[in-house]
Each structure stands twice: as structure tokens, then as C-alpha cells.
């Protein structure tokens, strides 16, 4: 797994480094006789996606003459204006007086599709191809037994005694594996953490039969 950028903006130079390293590693291992599968993990769940949709909604209104301020948590890059302009070119002012929640959700999914297509285009131009673009959202979709990948991974960890509840939150005993601290899986308010998604994703990889997992991550994952 490598690159795995959020679909909330263009790929940057760091992603290019990870693409070069990941692709080269896969090619060398494949040449050495390994059966290698390359995957891009799409971080398409969580509040950053709502913030992205709201960012486009604000730029859309501004481009149509509304005096609307960009919230602090939103994305201010010029590419957001480009996406908003694309919506104007297609829909005009259709969304200007729409229900704010409906507008944000529509723009979120539209902006997501736009940026994901851009990421596909850039990686293909770079010469990097993936066997799978894996959606984080799919980890929360129940199977025929009514259990999602998140549910199954929690069950597996619980059976091995690796999780506990403290102050209303569910924790993973990662310190038992030489981590610097235990990690929260589910917050006290019931919200899943990014780490929970990461655990479920890796559990899903093992369910699919992979026996050796290689991750190329950014510095923000150093603690993992």
C-alpha cells in the first residue's frame, strides 16, 4: 500500500516520492519471484470529506456573488475554486438557494469524484498502476452476516484480549506490541478513529489472503 492520499486535494511532491518508492519496491520484489499486489487506500470517510464539500459550497456561493466566509477547518486551495467553477458550468446557480445540508452533501460527492479522477490521471501518467483502489467507506458496509470489516476486526481483537474500555472509549493494547502508548479505537461519543479504520483495513487484507503487508506512509504516521 502506498500513496493513499486523501481525495481532498491534488497529489503533492511527497506523494510522488512514495509512488516512486512503492512502485520500485513492487517491481524489484516481483522480479525476485514474489506475487505482489499494489493497493491505494482511499481515505474517503470522516469529517475531512464533509469539510471538503463545505469548502466547495462556500467557493460556489462566492463565485456567484454571495458574501460567505470560508470556515477555518475548510480547504482554501485554488483547486477548490476550480471544482466550484466546474459545478457552475454544469448547473449554474441551481444550488445557490438549496438546502445547505443537501448542497454540501452533493458538492462533497461531486468534489470527491473530481479529485479521485485527478489522482487516477496523475498516477497513470506517472506510470504507477494499482490492482485496487480501496475505499475506506467499504470497511463500514455489512456483509451477508450483518458484520462490517470494522465489526469483524473488533471481534477478533476482543477474543484475543487486545481491547478494553476506559472512560467510555474503546482502546487497543498496542503498548503490548512495543508501541509508545495504547490507541483509541472508538471515542467515548461513539465516533470511530482513523486508527480503527486502519486496523479494519489491515484485517481485511489478511482476510483476503495476503501474508506479508508492506506500508509506505508519511511522517504523520510515525507513531504507528
Residue ranges and their predicted role:
Residues 1-224:
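NTP-dependent nucleotidyl-transfer catalytic core
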